[in-house]
Amino acid sequence: MDGWTEISRIAATTQPPKGPSPHIHEPASITSLKFDSVQNLIWCGDSFGYTRSFTPGPNSNGVNPYQQSLSFLPYTKFKSSLNNNPILQHLDHKDGILSLSSNCINFNNRRGLAKLSLSSDSFVDANSVLFKNLTSLTTNCNTMNDIVVGSNLSLLKFDLNKPSHLMSFNHDGNISIVNQTSKFLTLGKANGALELFDPVSNSSIKSFQGHTGLLSDLDVQGSYIATCGYSIRPRRYNHNSQNSNNDYMVDPLVNIYDVRMMRAVAPIPFPAGASCVRFHPKLPNIVLISSNSGQLQFVDIYDQTNVFLYQADLMPTSQPRQPSQLSKAPFMTNLEISENGDFFAFSDSYATMHLWTLNNSGSTITKDFVNFPASIEQPDVIIPPATEHIGVDDLVPLSTIGMPYYKDLLLSNYASDLSFTKELAKLPDPIDHDLLVESESHVGFFPYDKSKYGPANTAKKYQSLKERSNIHSTVNVPKFISERNNALTKTMSNTSLALQNLNKEHHNEIFQYKVPLSRKKIPNCYSRLQIQYSKFGVKDFDFSYYNRTDGLYCGLENDADNSYVNPLLQLYKFQPAFHNLMVRNLTNEWLPNDFETIITQKNPQGSSILNELGYLFDMMNKAKDKNVNMSNFSQVFKENRLAQTENLINLDEGAKLNSQALRNLIIGFNKFLIAEVYKDLMNQARDSSISSLMTVSYVMEVRGTGPSCPIYDKQFGSQLSLDLLTPPSNVLNKLSILLNPQINTQQQVVTPTTTRRNHNLITYLEYTINQFKTIPCQQHQHQYPHTLEVRSSITKLPPLLSLNVNLSNEEFKLINGFKKWLVPEFYALNNNNDAPIAFKPVLTQFDQDSTRYELLGYVCEISQQSDFSLGTHNLVSYVKIDGRWFLFNDFLVMQIPEEEVFNLSYPWKKPVILVYHDSSISGIPFDLFQIETFANLPGLNDSIIYRDHFAGSIRESHKKDYELLTRQEAPSLGTLIAIDAEFVNLRPEELEVRYDGHKKLIKPKFLSLARLSALRGDNGEKQGVAFIDDYVVHTGEIYDYLTSFSGIEPGDLDPINSEKNLVTLQTVYRKLWLLLNLGVVFVGHGLYNDFRGINLQVPQNQIRDTADFYYKSDFKRQLSLKFLAYVLLKEKVQTGNHDSIEDAYTALLLYKKYIEITATGEYESTLNYIYSEGQQLRFKVPE
């Protein structure tokens, strides 16, 4: 904190008012200072009850060119106390400023107009007699309108919106200073003690005796409290001084308290004697301390040797108005820091306000006390009427009449390059970027690409822009479920029915996979989809509209990070051998929980790519045609070191990727995924079956060509995928001659145009698996120049062949010209004695030893615009399932004709990853977990349900509120389990704010599981007893703990500092996954949100959600657990922070109550009673 300097001194008081009292002629002193948190104002209160405000004026340079000063202009001045009592404190509010004196509180707006004046006569309660001898005020915890006032008699509270009622807390008063943390009130007592008071429970929580005498100042920042004060000076002879006043001395220490640990931490020494203390608002570890003599110190509470010392000049710059002031030593009071931390101010005994700022670079001084200050309201400027008569004739210019005052540019001041068009008009289409690149070759004419731009010189049917915009508006997004339900309840006329049929036809355009050649447009089914959010959240989005598989296959949501991997995951999911390998691994248990894994390897989830892929596949199986979120997989993938090293993490939905970069990214992920699954299988289960499934074997031979070169080497290797290569032009031309002998090479040059009908994938495969090149020999080059022959050949193809088509844009243009480049199947002739593998499109009677490969599907890149544009490309996948082809575009899933799958003539369609599999493994049945047989699966490890598995060290002091299950209580089909989950917010929501102030949710906040509780639900002695109460470890940054909803405090999830026994996320998830597959029935309140946050797909017949049971569709309002417990169970829950065990138990009781009223036929009457009570209570539990 080096570089602070004084920039201004302000005479903040004026001459005192005249009065009969003899002491009224004493000069006014400054008794209160406050920086405004909304506007650039400093508030100042004096000893005669006046409040003044100042605002920064223009900068000015001093005598030293490196020293600058800031002038201040007076803004307002008004009386804000009764009977000339001093202003003790100011408290700023969004609507004005509150001024406190010993017997009243005034609330004025920032212009000085009175909004409210409160004294003991203002209240109608019996507590009004306590409204005197006031000392301090603050806002209540996490509120702006509840004002808490401390006095010598009690602790009081009133509401600015209802100022006629005064409430008294259960406190005996004797308060000097009041402040607040997020949960408690901090009370500085007159005897030097510090007290923490809970306004919710109306009780004192903790008390500290920090100073034996008086308390002079107190400040709060986060979970830290700083105090300074006085101690009683010990006397040597006190036998005659029993009735005399005590002597006090300034404490040379500043006490620091941590409310998280509820104890004092190391104090800060300050030998000069601390009179004021303030935390820096932007650097919470920095404390500013001042003494009466003007000494200032910036101290780091974590490193108290890091001190910056300053001395304030308290001597007046001019002669004091009263001679008596010369005989007194100047002293310093009222230290305050601005909200942005760039300024601090204090006053002295000469009624002067000093302003300091941080300016260590000589730059221009900022004038802002807050980061984004609101403009100060200025008085209206009255323009005097013109006295001269202005004639209107040809000699008088029109500019003689002045323009009115305006802030915005006039319409006549538009830019010269700005063109205005008619309504609904649009700018011309941009020139294709590919044409601009080719124009640099200085070729006069280019051949017209009919496949890219459609037929040339064709007349189009006229369609107005309004009609086109109407069609596009119906294609984009279907209605929200709530809007659609509202529309169905209305009576429609014949006209509206016809309009609905028209809209339905337009809505079906999203599933259009082929467009007429006359329209240069990519079909709507390939468009980039975006999830829309209404006021009811993502639950209101109609995912089922985009799924046309008749309840068979699900889509993946694309609002999570790294959602570009969705098409590849959907492709591999439908390969039975790969799918079964991933899912079978889940029967084994792999739950690392050591600090090496969690902290060093940065794997706080304690999971792996293999496990998360298996969980994801199982959830996709259970979801049927419901959408699935892959955020759990994304979190583990994002923390993977190899993925970070290979730059495979994408957090902006590909906004900065062009066509080639997106293809490189998905191909890189394909290689990473297969390699990581192979590594995880070896580490977790010593299973190498993925190697026999996907390994491509090759041999590389190096031979010298010289007569005496001895170099010869032969090496064997393997890889898990194969990169496809484009044959060079001479190879393609040679193959064209062999396949088409009628070509006359002497008269016609072989070009890609002449080879388009001759080549397909097999040509590329044969070139890829047999590579030959020559390189200079470096070892014997000095004897005679010769070369080395390097030959590599594929010797064995796996049953599951993954081909990476990593070609350039120019090479893809060549593929677009081949009519049948992509083949549905081919045959690989098995080699003998390391002979090269041969490929054939069909099998003859002479080819017996061969393997038939079928196309499972492929990932395809869709270029919505030019290949070089950023963020306009997306990935889809085609998958063949049970003889039918399906298109997967994130959560859009639809059947598509086979001819469209193999049609690669579109320039915007580029195959990126092809997956072929051996026909012998294509018919393997999928392993699906069935709840009836799950418990008897061979090798199933379900021990995690019956034991603890804490991450890192075990905190013995942590109290267990649960009792583990025993094997005798093993869950089975139909077992009732009551659960409740609490979450923390890792990322805030993204909002789009329109010009009219309307806010649209772009991406919701990202919640992560923080605590899970599960209770026994079946009737018996242990009904309602918890058997799971797990806190989930988090090592990353947490944006918001949501303490008032989750009950999670800062530090509770930290594996190092937490006092709770933590578990990894996979440990909690595996417990729920096992319970789900064992067939238990989950009871809870709002389980949709819980399961969505956990990423668990639970069938509806295993859910008992009390939020749905006690829901009346006519009201369109779901009731809270707290309100239902109050009305039905006559109990008050969630009185403090939420407790997930309490919430789960309450949901269980509500479910039992639902069974009871349903059996007695009282369900409808009870539901009507609940909503009737809710309307009277406004659906809130009375305090």
From Swiss-Prot:
PROSITE patterns: USP_3. It holds the Pfam family PAN2_N. Keywords: Cytoplasm, Exonuclease, Hydrolase, Metal-binding, mRNA processing, Nuclease, Repeat, WD repeat. It is an enzyme of class 3 (hydrolase). Binds 2 metal cations per subunit in the catalytic exonuclease domain. Signal peptide: none annotated. One of its GO terms (molecular function) is nucleic acid binding. Residues 521-919 form the USP domain. It is found in: Cytoplasm. InterPro entries: Exonuclease_RNaseT/DNA_pol3, PAN2, PAN2-PAN3_catalytic_subunit, PAN2_N, PAN2_UCH_dom, Papain-like_cys_pep_sf, RNaseH-like_sf, RNaseH_sf. Catalytic subunit of the poly(A)-nuclease (PAN) deadenylation complex, one of two cytoplasmic mRNA deadenylases involved in mRNA turnover. PAN specifically shortens poly(A) tails of RNA and the activity is stimulated by poly(A)-binding protein PAB1. PAN deadenylation is followed by rapid degradation of the shortened mRNA tails by the CCR4-NOT complex. Deadenylated mRNAs are then degraded by two alternative mechanisms, namely exosome-mediated 3'-5' exonucleolytic degradation, or deadenylation-dependent mRNA decaping and subsequent 5'-3' exonucleolytic degradation by XRN1. Belongs to the peptidase C19 family. PAN2 subfamily. This is PAN2-PAN3 deadenylation complex catalytic subunit PAN2. The gene is PAN2.
